[in-house]
Amino acid sequence: MRHIIRETVVGLAVALPVLASAGVAFAAAGDGDAERAARWQELQKQVFGDRKVEPGKLVSIDMPVRAEDAALVPVTLTVADKDQVKGLYLIIDDNPAPLAAHVDFGPAGDPAQLKMRVRVNTYSNVHAVAETKDGRLVASEIFVKASGGCSAPMGMTDADAMKGMGDMRMKFSDLTADKAMPATLMIRHPNFSGMQMNQVSREYTPARYLDRISVSQGARNVFTLEGDISISSNPVIGFEMRPEGSAPITVAATDSQGGTFDHTFPVPAVSN
């Protein structure tokens, strides 16, 4: 994953110089269309290099236009022609780390729909970019009004936020023959952004977030997600998969401080 702002973001005192040195223009809620368009052009270069990103309707974004909780904003990406798509990018243009997630789908994955919760730090365009199997990049856009999502405290001590870190649960819908199976993965992890102030010590909590999540059934990969601080605490990821046989589903995750977490889940029985 191309981190635009890497895990050196450990607090506002560090984050602001890092952003400035990276040449990232600071966003403002009152920015006009021209400023936002220029920022998107710069982000395309940072994330995709010289590759062309074309607008289109291959992937759609469903998010609340005005977020009730900027630290827990639900987002659903829906792919119009899933057989074309091998990966998805979610970019929150005006976040300190704009590239929220890059998801690559494996042979057991189904790109039809992907759900997660994200932090939105200020009024921002949000882009979803679908990468096709023939190498095209197709982007869609939505504007979201939110404020302070990356710096919002979790409402508990850091120690409490880290209790049970790495615990996982998986919920499955009914498995029907010849159809993709919806599933929801829940991982307990604070995903500290580095911009949250400890309400007791009044110091910034160092960044610690899940940077890679891989889901597989046996030797067949479902998806691999590379993430950053824009994914909300205690990530919840909704996805679809096409299981084969009875091999268990394995989840392996790592975080930016070297933590490793894994869990195995049995495959549900096929419904009649």
Placement of each model-derived feature along the sequence:
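Bacterial N-terminal signal peptides that target proteins for export
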Residues: 1-12
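A general "mature secreted/periplasmic domain" signal
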Residues: 28-156, 170-180, 184-271
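Long, charged amphipathic helices and adjacent flexible linkers at domain junctions
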Residues: 155, 160-167
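Sec/Tat signal peptide C-region and signal peptidase I cleavage site
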Residues: 18-27
